[in-house]
Amino acid sequence: MSLAFIDPMIIRSLNKSKLRKKILYLLYKMYPHGIYLSEISRRVRSDPSNVLGCLKGMNGRYNGHFSLIELGLVECVERGGVKIYKLTDYGKKIVEVLKDQDSDFIESLRW
C-alpha cells in the first residue's frame, strides 16, 4: 500500500536527525518484532540516552513533538516489566515510501 501524503512533520523530524532515521530503519529491519533500548543503542552505535531521546523526546535536546513515538512511527510495548520498541504499521508504510529516496543513507548503515 502506498501513501499519497506524508506529514511534513515526519519528514522534518527525520531530516533533522540521522539518529532518528537510523533507529527507524533498524526497527524496519526487525519488523514485526521489537527490540530493547540497549540493543537499539548498540546497533546504531549511540548512547542509550540519545536513543531514548529520539524515541520519546527528552528535555530540550530532543523535542517530544518530533519523537518517533509521538509521530506514531514507533510504539513501546511493556512485556514482563521490560520495554520493547517496535515499528508501527504506519511507521512501516512511511519507511517503505522513503527507502527509495534514502538508498544511499541505507547503504551507509552497518548493522
UniProtKB/Swiss-Prot annotation:
Alphabetical list of InterPro entries matching this protein: ArsR-like_HTH, EarA-like, WH-like_DNA-bd_sf, WH_DNA-bd_sf
Transmembrane segments annotated in the record for this chain: none
Protein name: Uncharacterized protein MJ0905
